[in-house]
């Protein structure tokens, strides 16, 4: 599966002049090597990290933590934020703060925190759990899941220590235009790159 993606990664690297991250099906340091040589700037792992936390260490030691994003899909179950794998289909035994601390200890460079409860709803990011996670570790946290308005981005950056915010549907369906969001956030004093 991974090797079918190599042509796509190479094509993106040739045609896009911004850093990009590749994930899905990455199980070994060799997979990472192939993707980085193909042009990926960073890689992201999720299920394979949970199933084999030493993979985080192996990747970090061989390629540097700066290229490793550990993606963490979470859902609130009976008041506890649990970690899920396999595209959100399978609950793990990990509570989110416990897992991100393990990921950081093993060498994760960043955490991509996706609230499955909020994903696609456009009702705003999960601010409380994002803040709890960001305060529990010393690596960057990217919030994901729920963005619906420009103010949602302002809120996640002012009420949490999240260093980034990921959104998809609001951009795909032109609910928010990226230049407008940048203008809004800049005018509110949020530093952007």
Tell where the protein language model's regions lie, with residue ranges.
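Short beta->alpha connector loops at strand-helix junctions that form conserved
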Residues: 24, 45-48, 168
């Amino acid at each position: 599966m991974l090797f079918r993606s190599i042509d796509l990664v190479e094509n993106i690297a040739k045609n896009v002049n911004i850093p990009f991250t590749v994930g899905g099906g990455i199980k070994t340091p060799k997979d990472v090597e192939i993707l980085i040589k193909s042009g990926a700037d960073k890689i992201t792992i999720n299920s394979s990290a949970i199933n084999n936390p030493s993979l985080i260490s192996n990747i970090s030691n061989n390629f540097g933590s700066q290229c490793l994003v550990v993606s963490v899909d979470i859902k609130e179950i009976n008041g506890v934020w649990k970690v899920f794998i396999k595209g959100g289909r399978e609950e793990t035994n990990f509570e989110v703060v416990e897992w991100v601390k393990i990921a950081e200890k093993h060498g994760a460079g960043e955490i991509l925190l996706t609230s499955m409860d909020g994903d696609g709803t456009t009702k705003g990011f999960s601010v409380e759990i994002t803040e709890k996670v960001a305060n529990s570790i010393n690596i960057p946290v990217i919030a994901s899941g729920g963005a619906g308005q420009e103010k949602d981005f302002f809120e996640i950056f002012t009420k949490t220590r999240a260093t980034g915010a990921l959104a998809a549907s609001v951009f795909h369906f032109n609910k928010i235009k990226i230049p407008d969001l940048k203008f809004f956030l800049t005018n509110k004093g949020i530093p952007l790159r």
